[in-house]
Design a protein with these regions (language model features):
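N-terminal Rossmann-like NAD(P) cofactor-binding subdomain of oxidoreductases
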Residues: 1-184
């Protein structure tokens, strides 16, 4: 958080023009910035890395513009998590518009790929379900304690990671005491 607090600017399309500490009250007294509008073309020499937290299917529009300025990117969307274009298009149902970068993207799981992440130009941050599934599986697979086709992942998640836009499926009165299948 100290690095975030020392940044010269921060961008949030949804909150452009609003004070950071008004949107994120826990930062009150620590940061004196307003959220700015994203101007990709003017990033140039201002930044070394962009942490891109945009919806899935949007990052692939921004990443080429950012990388063409030789700026490193950490992408929180799913757009670069898979390094195979055909697999991505099968799972997400859309064409990937920047497939040439997919094979060279580093999967941002530091417990597994720490050294590769350090030197990466594009890091695909893993999602919560893959992280929950991969981390406990690494030692049991490495030690050959289980057959790969015998692994069952039964993961549950709260609604806090579902984004800030209200939806019937994430509205607390509709979710409280309910279990909803994800991604079926």
């Amino acid at each position: 958080i100290q690095r975030f607090l020392s940044q010269p600017f921060t961008v949030a399309e949804t909150f452009t023009g609003q004070r950071v500490d008004r949107v994120l009250p826990n930062l009150r007294g620590f940061i004196d910035l307003d959220f700015e509008k994203l101007e990709i073309q003017s990033l140039g020499n201002q930044v070394d890395v962009v942490i891109l937290a945009v919806p899935h299917k949007v990052a692939m529009e921004f990443v080429p513009q950012i990388r063409n300025q030789d700026i490193r990117v950490i992408d929180f969307s799913a757009d670069y998590r898979l390094n195979n274009q055909l697999v991505y298009e099968k799972w997400y149902g859309i064409d990937h518009t920047d497939p040439s970068r997919m094979p060279n993207t580093i999967y941002g799981l530091p417990e597994r790929y720490r050294d590769l992440i350090r030197g990466a130009d594009l890091v695909a941050n893993p999602g919560c379900y893959p992280t929950t599934s991969i981390l406990p599986s690494i030692p049991i697979i490495s030690e050959q304690l289980v057959e790969l086709d015998q692994i069952i992942i039964d993961a549950k998640s709260g609604i806090s990671g579902a984004g800030s836009k209200p939806k019937d499926t994430t509205h607390y009165p509709n979710r409280e005491s309910n279990l909803v299948a994800y991604g079926l």
